[in-house]
């Protein structure tokens, strides 16, 4: 799969990178946590002037669309403390380390959260939720040829799993009922693949 971050020949990127790219002058770490680090960087802008960037550094994550032959998808309902509400999301989780194999992480998170085992995993590309301040790269996958296994939730995980038709999820996205960005992005890609006969 071509990487749109580095491949200018994909037909979308037209600007000269030199006209847009910022370069780091120095970096200062303010906080190191279990999930993310907080840094402040001084950078040089394309016009040569200095500026400052406040950044959240994250080790990365994966998210999976478990698609059954009847075009239903296993999704989760989970309370998200940061936004104070229950969200509908696809199975997802952070990497154990920045260099962890992402496919293995996707298979692990799918199995732990839903009990599902994927016979086939297809990469859908990467998703950046808030690239102005966070470097978290979420790699999205489509899981098919599913079989049942056993869930193994972490001690601090509380979620319910159910199957919803892909078409109903599309309607819910249009109604604004699925505000989670990675879930919107991954489901939209799968819907396009279905429309184009790719799956």
Predicted regions and their residues:
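Short glycine/serine/proline-enriched coil/turn segments at secondary-structure junctions
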Residues: 33, 82, 130-133
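Unchanged
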Residues: 51, 60-63, 68, 94-181
């Amino acid at each position: 799969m071509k990487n749109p971050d580095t491949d200018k020949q994909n037909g979308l990127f037209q600007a000269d990178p030199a006209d847009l790219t910022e370069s780091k002058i120095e970096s200062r770490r303010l906080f190191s946590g279990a999930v993310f680090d907080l840094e402040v960087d001084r950078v040089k802008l394309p016009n040569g002037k200095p500026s400052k960037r406040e950044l959240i550094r994250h080790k990365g994550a994966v998210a999976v669309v478990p698609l059954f032959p009847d075009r239903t998808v296993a999704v989760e309902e989970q309370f998200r403390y940061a936004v104070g509400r229950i969200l509908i999301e696809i199975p997802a989780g952070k990497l154990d380390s920045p260099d962890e194999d992402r496919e293995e992480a996707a298979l692990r998170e799918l199995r732990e959260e839903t009990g599902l085992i994927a016979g086939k995993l297809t990469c859908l590309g990467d998703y950046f939720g808030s690239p102005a301040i966070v470097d978290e790269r979420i790699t999205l996958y489509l899981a098919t040829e599913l079989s049942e296994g056993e869930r193994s939730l972490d001690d601090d995980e509380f979620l319910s799993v159910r199957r919803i038709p892909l078409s109903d999820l599309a309607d819910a996205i249009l109604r604004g009922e699925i505000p989670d960005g990675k879930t919107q992005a991954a489901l939209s890609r799968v819907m396009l693949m279905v429309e184009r006969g790719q799956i």
